[in-house]
């Protein structure tokens, strides 16, 4: 890594197993976990040539990510550059960046060797899009970074936000089926109704990904975090959001499962609400965040994308 990446961030990138990467689509942020590596001061990932991320990056190169280590979390924003052997438009920069790409490829293979072993075990199940001919290599250049401990901001580098403008009246959605009702039962049961997740928010500066606690309550999906953490994104009162929750596997892609709830958010600072405070307090407690310092994002789901291994689907909550 170069000196442009703070040493504490570099250590988290070396220790973390997955990077939760967000891109911006015309309908809001898209967020999924990806295996990755760090090299030459950048984060490197691969994705299918026809994936949502690859298509969105052609329109908008702004990107954000989140990496967790055992005790700390690193969040970053930046821009993406892709390298595709089948796209002649990337050949010139691929040649120019040859030594860096070779270094990145070495680190990527070394860091994720256990997943390549998993692919070998499941070789007869792996779709073409998940094999090298169907992939593009992506370079994420970090422009802003932050470290969070126990969900709270410990350090930040770059021009992050510092305020949360929440609604005055928070409305919880107690009626209707769970937003995860359309997710296959095995995945839904594995995820449960609350836990640790990642939230991508669409902002005027591009996507921002933050660590959150999440909960399902009645017909609503919610993300909760200390207000100072959400302030990094300086969100509007009603941003487009994507909440991603998953059950990772340490070596086998076929065993990974998760869901992404995409839709419109409603931001509220629990202690500042003029009405709906009791419901917001209860939901923050359900998610596992101290209400006195909690910011809550209620999500009106437009779509829920789920995956298990290489199988995925989309449901549209009522």
Tell me the role of every PLM-derived stretch.
Residues 1-3, 72-182, 227-230, 242-318:
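Charged, gly/pro-rich active-site loop segments
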Residues 1-20, 167-198:
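Short, basic/aromatic recognition patches
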Residues 8, 52, 230:
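Short Gly/charged-rich anion-binding patches and loops
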Residues 11, 26, 68-70, 128-130, ...:
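Generic marker of residues within folded, mature protein domains
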Residues 16-49, 55, 63-69, 74-79, ...:
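Short beta-strand segments
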Residues 54-58, 231-236:
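Surface-exposed connector loops and short turns at secondary-structure junctions
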Residues 177, 186-190, 199-201, 206, ...:
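Compositionally biased accessory segments in Actinobacterial proteins
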Residues 238-240:
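Extracellular Ig-like/FN3 beta-sandwich strand-entry sites
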């Amino acid at each position: 890594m170069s000196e442009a990446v703070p040493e504490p961030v570099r250590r988290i990138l070396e220790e973390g197993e997955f990077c939760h990467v967000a891109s911006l689509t015309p309908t809001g942020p898209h967020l999924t976990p990806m295996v990755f590596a760090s090299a030459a001061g950048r984060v490197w990932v691969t994705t299918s040539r026809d994936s949502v991320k690859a298509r969105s990056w052609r329109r908008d190169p702004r990107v954000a990510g989140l990496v967790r280590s055992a005790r700390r979390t690193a969040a970053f924003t930046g821009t993406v550059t892709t390298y595709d052997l089948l796209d002649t438009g990337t050949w010139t920069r691929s040649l120019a960046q040859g030594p860096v790409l070779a270094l990145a490829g070495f680190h990527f293979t070394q860091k994720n060797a256990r997943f390549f072993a998993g692919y070998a075990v499941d070789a007869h199940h792996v779709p073409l899009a998940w094999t090298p001919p169907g992939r593009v290599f992506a370079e994420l250049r970090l422009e802003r970074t932050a470290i969070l401990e126990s969900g709270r901001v410990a350090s930040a580098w770059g021009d992050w936000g510092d305020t949360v403008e929440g609604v005055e009246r928070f409305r919880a959605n107690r009626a209707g089926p769970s937003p995860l009702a359309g997710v296959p039962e095995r995945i839904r049961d594995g995820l449960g109704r609350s836990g640790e997740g990642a939230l991508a928010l669409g902002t005027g500066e591009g996507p921002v990904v933050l660590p959150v606690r999440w909960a399902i309550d009645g017909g609503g999906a919610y993300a909760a975090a200390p207000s100072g953490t959400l302030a990094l994104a300086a969100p509007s009162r009603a941003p487009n959001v994507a909440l991603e929750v998953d059950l990772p596997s340490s070596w086998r892609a076929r065993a990974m499962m998760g869901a992404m709830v995409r839709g419109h958010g409603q931001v509220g600072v629990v202690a500042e609400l003029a009405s709906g405070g009791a419901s917001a307090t209860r939901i923050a407690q359900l998610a596992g965040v101290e209400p006195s310092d909690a910011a809550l994002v209620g999500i009106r789901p437009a779509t829920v994308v789920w995956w298990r291994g290489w199988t995925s689907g989309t449901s549209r909550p009522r």
